[in-house]
């Protein structure tokens, strides 16, 4: 048989394909893998994401769908600016070079993208539209500017959204984030908190884990606000938020955030005290939940940290008893949650209990329960109210409803929901981003740029060695004229957070015209299958859901949910390698040392990361094994949602398997002149069952199971010798989504002028799948002996007995039986 010249095969097959054609008469299917940042190099982790999407796109085309499968570049961002500083290259040039390189890599692996729709977010043709969106949001009251205390990354010298602060550090730089107050633009995502939360119920095609993460981040708390008057200050009060209003009679103190307005208004803290609390206050993105602990998804352990409070000079009055309660400024009360003020009921809240113990505050139980241990708070929402005046004798839920009605009727409070979700800060102090289309005029104040003057583009000549934002220091770009009065004005020198660009790109792909074309969006949106990492659950996916709603409100599109189904692929992992000094090595470095006889420590299989150097270069793999082997292996072992361990042995096995397929087909092609082999009924039933299972697995995106079925069919055809044009076509048709180059090449040999790409999927006979017989493979010491047909209801003993006759007099040491699949006899004597 001929050698497996995959490079020649890839070149041949790619010359046949046209991925830009579409038929609007067919039912649409929109499959989209999250578009990449153009870092310049694709690794195996990228491969898995994109191949999953490509397999699905090819399969759906074969089912007759009009498939939209586009690609683009998330091209703005800080790495390009860093390259400009470190390598003295303009961000645009750096980005364009990387895009060209990655485009070549993506095309080399046979991804069936419609390249005619390719977009780049750093192109003025793209960001002109998002500048229009921003102006529409501004007009609709969805965008606003205010002085705000922000998360400042001192290394990247930019503002970070709460979601971009992880354990107090910048999500990119890892620097400890500090607080600053500067003017910032915001989008009113908080106005959509309830809608975003309820919308999750309709997303039945999303993983529950992602929906839970978004639910926690939105952080809805149902409760009430209650007014506590301030002693000595007529008609002044503190409005507290609580999810447990029924425990009001157990209140022994009130506490406010260090950022509560009263701290400044009543001069409650010295500068030193204020700084102590600012440092001690736990991350404000982890919000307070009166029931018992934090409801957030990060820093959960902080609920156990020391509760620090500074006793103020004022007291507040209990709204029912009139008792005076001490007021603290405390490190566990957050300005961004509820009203920034709480009442403390130590007997029924773990955090309040810890605070009360530290400051020797009263602890009065107002819920009677079987629990008699007063050394611990009773936090469950059940029991009978006691020591609670008019609430005594009521069940907790009944008392909660009653107290809310009471405070509403006498005008000291009302039912209220609070949300953790804060408005999205979109200003970034960097050059390589989309300019914000507003100017500032001394006479007219802030003015939006006229739509006809868009896009506001970036200046080419920029000095990147200056500290902070290069646009702020540009000698000419920021100076312009006011669109209202014509007088001198200054441009806003901030640029949009790059998540602004990625929050609508899926809609831009719907039309080749650019921007959002409503009719095209009606045709293709929502995305039917969106594929990407679970690390985007809160950031990108939540922002995109909000942005879609904002675009809907402004009349651009008709949908509110952008992604019907979501697949979060698992990470690609690899062994780590270290030299004798403990330094991490790239796989090729480790191999080189081993060849020299030097010691290499092989570590556990971990997520691929540049820091541990356990990354595998995609170009090297494709060059050595071919695109099809890389595609086939990356989907072969685990379900797409699970992590995947890369190994040289695995990719080599996939390469050899594809070579085996090539040899099998060529064996048929070389012998077909001798006449077609008639496929027996038993083999037909087996093939029919494989097609049935394969179709089911493809529909369910169980791609590793589908790969197993390809193996099963190859084994069946090899063992039975049932090689015919019909059976070979079945093999190539189900192989094509996974190894398209080889399948296309062999299909051209099978029949002239036939292109496999886009041809109909193979059908199966439902009646044959109901057969009462099953065909098993009989093996001896792992080697194929013969196929054996048995009745489905045969016992294991009967099957083994029948199979044993096929190995004659061999001495059997052990029998491995896989129901419905195989009997393997391990024999010490050949017989």
Swiss-Prot record:
The keyword Amino-acid biosynthesis does not apply. A motif ('KMSKS' region) lies at residues 607-611. Keywords: Aminoacyl-tRNA synthetase, ATP-binding, Cytoplasm, Ligase, Nucleotide-binding, Protein biosynthesis. Signal peptide: none annotated. One of its GO terms (cellular component) is cytoplasm. A motif ('HIGH' region) lies at residues 36-46. It catalyses: tRNA(Leu) + L-leucine + ATP = L-leucyl-tRNA(Leu) + AMP + diphosphate. Pfam families: Anticodon_1 (PF08264), tRNA-synt_1 (PF00133), tRNA-synt_1_2 (PF13603), tRNA-synt_1g (PF09334). It is found in: Cytoplasm. InterPro entries: aa-tRNA-synth_I_CS (IPR001412), aa-tRNA-synth_Ia (IPR002300), Leu-tRNA-ligase (IPR002302), Leu_tRNA-synth_edit (IPR025709), M/V/L/I-tRNA-synth_anticd-bd (IPR013155), Methionyl/Leucyl_tRNA_Synth (IPR015413), Rossmann-like_a/b/a_fold (IPR014729), tRNAsynth_Ia_anticodon-bd (IPR009080). It comes from the Bacteria. GO terms for biological process: leucyl-tRNA aminoacylation. ATP binds at residue 610. One of its GO terms (molecular function) is leucine-tRNA ligase activity. CDD domains: LeuRS_core (cd00812). Its EC number is 6.1.1.4. Belongs to the class-I aminoacyl-tRNA synthetase family. This is Leucine--tRNA ligase. The lineage of its organism: Bacteria, Pseudomonadati, Pseudomonadota, Alphaproteobacteria, Rickettsiales.
């Amino acid at each position: 048989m001929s050698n497996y010249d995959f490079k020649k095969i890839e070149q041949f097959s790619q010359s046949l394909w046209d991925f830009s054609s579409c038929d609007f008469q067919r039912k649409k299917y929109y499959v989209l893998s999250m578009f990449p940042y153009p870092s310049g190099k694709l690794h195996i982790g990228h491969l898995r994401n994109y191949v999953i999407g490509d397999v699905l796109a090819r399969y759906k085309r074969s089912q007759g769908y009009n498939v939209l499968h586009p690609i683009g570049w998330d091209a703005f961002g800080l790495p390009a600016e860093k390259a400009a500083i470190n390598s003295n290259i303009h961000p645009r040039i750096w980005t364009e070079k990387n895009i060209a390189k990655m485009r070549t890599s993506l095309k080399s692996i046979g991804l069936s993208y419609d390249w005619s729709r390719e977009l780049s977010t750093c192109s003025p043709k793209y960001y002109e539209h998002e500048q229009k969106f921003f102006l529409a949001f501004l007009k609709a009251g969805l965008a606003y500017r205010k002085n705000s205390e922000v998360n400042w990354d001192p290394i990247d010298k930019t503002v970070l959204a709460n979601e971009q602060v992880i354990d107090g550090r910048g999500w990119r730089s890892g620097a400890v984030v500090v607080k600053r107050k500067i003017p910032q633009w915001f989008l009113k995502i908080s106005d959509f908190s309830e809608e975003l939360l309820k919308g999750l119920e309709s997303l039945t095609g999303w993983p529950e884990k992602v929906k839970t993460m978004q639910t926690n981040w939105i952080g809805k708390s149902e409760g009430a606000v209650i007014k506590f008057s301030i002693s000595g200050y007529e008609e002044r009060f503190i409005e507290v938020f609580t999810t447990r209003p029924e425990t009001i009679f157990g209140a022994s103190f009130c506490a406010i955030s260090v950022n509560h307005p009263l701290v400044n208004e009543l001069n409650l803290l010295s500068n030193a005290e204020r700084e102590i609390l600012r440092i001690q206050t736990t991350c404000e993105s982890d919000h307070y939940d009166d029931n018992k602990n934090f409801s957030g998804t990060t820093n959960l352990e902080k609920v156990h940290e020391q509760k620090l409070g500074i006793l103020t000079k004022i007291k507040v009055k209990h709204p029912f008893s009139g008792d005076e309660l001490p007021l603290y400024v405390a490190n566990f009360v957050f300005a961004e949650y509820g009203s920034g003020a709480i009442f403390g009921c130590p007997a029924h809240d773990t955090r309040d209990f810890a605070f009360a113990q530290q400051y020797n505050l009263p602890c009065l139980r107002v819920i009677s329960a079987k629990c008699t241990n007063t050394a611990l708070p009773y936090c469950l929402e059940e029991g009978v109210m006691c020591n609670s005046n008019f609430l005594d004798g009521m069940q907790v839920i009944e008392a909660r409803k009653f107290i809310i009605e009471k405070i509403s009727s006498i005008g000291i409070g009302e039912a209220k929901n609070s949300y953790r979700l804060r408005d999205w800060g979109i200003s970034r102090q960097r050059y390589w981003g989309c300019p914000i289309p507003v100017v500032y005029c001394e006479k007219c104040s802030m003015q939006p740029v006229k739509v006809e003057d868009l896009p506001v583009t970036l200046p080419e000549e920029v000095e990147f060695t200056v500290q902070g934002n290069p646009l702020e220091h540009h000698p000419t770009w920021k100076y312009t004229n006011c669109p209202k009065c014509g007088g001198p004005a200054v441009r806003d020198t901030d640029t949009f957070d790059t998540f602004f660009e990625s929050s609508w790109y899926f809609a831009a792909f719907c039309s080749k015209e650019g921007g959002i074309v409503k009719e095209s969006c009606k045709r293709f949106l929502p995305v039917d299958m969106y594929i990407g990492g679970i690390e985007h659950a809160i950031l990108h996916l939540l922002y995109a859901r909000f942005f879609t709603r904002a675009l809907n409100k402004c009349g651009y599109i008709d949908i509110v949910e952008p992604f019907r189904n979501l697949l979060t692929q698992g990470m690609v992992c690899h062994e780590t390698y270290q030299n004798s000094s403990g330094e991490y090595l790239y796989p090729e470095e480790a191999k080189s040392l081993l060849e020299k006889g030097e010691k290499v420590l092989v570590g556990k299989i971990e997520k691929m990361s540049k820091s541990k150097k356990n990354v595998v270069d995609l170009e090297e793999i494709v060059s050595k094994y071919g695109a099809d082997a890389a595609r086939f292996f990356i989907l072969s072992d685990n379900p797409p949602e699970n992590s995947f361990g890369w190994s040289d042995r695995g990719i080599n096995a996939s390469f050899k398997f594809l070579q085996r397929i090539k040899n099998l087909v060529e064996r048929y092609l070389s012998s077909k002149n001798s006449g077609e082999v008639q496929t027996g009924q038993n083999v037909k039933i087996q093939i029919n069952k494989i097609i049935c299972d394969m179709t089911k697995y493809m529909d369910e995106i169980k791609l590793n199971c589908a790969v197993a079925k390809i193996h099963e069919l190859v084994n069946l055809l090899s063992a039975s010798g049932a090689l015919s044009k019909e059976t070979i076509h079945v093999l190539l048709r189900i192989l094509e989504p996974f190894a398209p180059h080889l399948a296309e090449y062999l299909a051209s040999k099978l029949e002239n002028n036939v292109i496999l790409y886009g041809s109909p999927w193979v059908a199966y006979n439902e009646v044959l799948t109901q057969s009462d017989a099953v065909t098993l493979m009989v093996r001896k010491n792992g080697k194929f002996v013969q196929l054996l047909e048995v009745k489905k209801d045969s016992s294991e003993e009967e099957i083994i007995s029948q199979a044993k006759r096929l190995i004659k007099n061999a001495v059997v040491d052990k029998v491995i039986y896989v129901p419905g699949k195989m009997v393997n006899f391990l024999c010490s004597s050949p017989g």
